[in-house]
């Protein structure tokens, strides 16, 4: 079969949806299928190429609205060659982008069976006239896609619940996932020793944060919490991997706060493997954070807010330490408790790892998608 993934943003742009698409496309190829990815144009990258994995990529002209966070497809994109590829099944990533609307309408017109896979649990914009306009647009986009008749799926149960906001009953889940064996290999290949590189004592606890550096993700509050811990006699270091508007301010804080910028994926895995805990104090409308899955795969103790996917991966306090507040003082108290009892922290991490391996692997997710595609192809 020829699978086509429509994803408005794709690698090398970092992000969970981008890696989700890449991982499923690779599983398509491994199973003997063909994988196409249709995404937005990026400066310096060709309109069409086949990458090192064998994934065929189409980049359609788009305007980089909101500093590239919301690419808007330009009218009448050159796609005749795409539709000539004999696409058997399409996966349309996310419900909100203009490319998603275009892809759904084109797939219906071309008679290509498809599903829509959503990754969020909230509106893209909040507050004021812009927030109201954004909500109106999202409902309009969903209504257009719904009219095409394709089933909607969510990457977590929370996403499926959020889809009801748009009058959509999800057909099922295609959860975010990881490959534990692949991550273990990345952790051991030419590892970067973060403690040695930054002249930390071998026993110094490392707290890791991986994500976009925007206020909703909580990195700045976490940095303040770590500063408070050190002032109160708990020596520890915070390593922040990611980019965004808060990056420069975080860099200026200096030790024990280390803003590393964007890291290659192997180094993110190595950081999680070496960390004493991974902290995600997010208040963002997450879908199912990939970093939580990767931390669980690395057996890194997790400290997190209740966010999308946590109820499935980390059902209760025996799997992770949950935050009831993201205030720096509350973060500091939660981290202090985790660092003070590493045995309990690692017992939780082992439970999270076991649950991950049972339910959240790419092999399992692709098997579900492949079965769905085969059934849809027969009906068409």
Language model segments and positions:
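Conserved donor-binding/catalytic core segment of Leloir-type glycosyltransferases
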Residues: 4, 153, 201-217, 223-226
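Short alpha-helical donor nucleotide-sugar binding micro-motif in glycosyltransferases
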Residues: 262-263, 271-275
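Conserved acidic donor-binding segment of nucleotide-sugar-dependent glycosyltransferases
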Residues: 316-328, 337-343
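Acidic donor-binding loop of glycosyltransferase active sites
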Residues: 273-287, 300
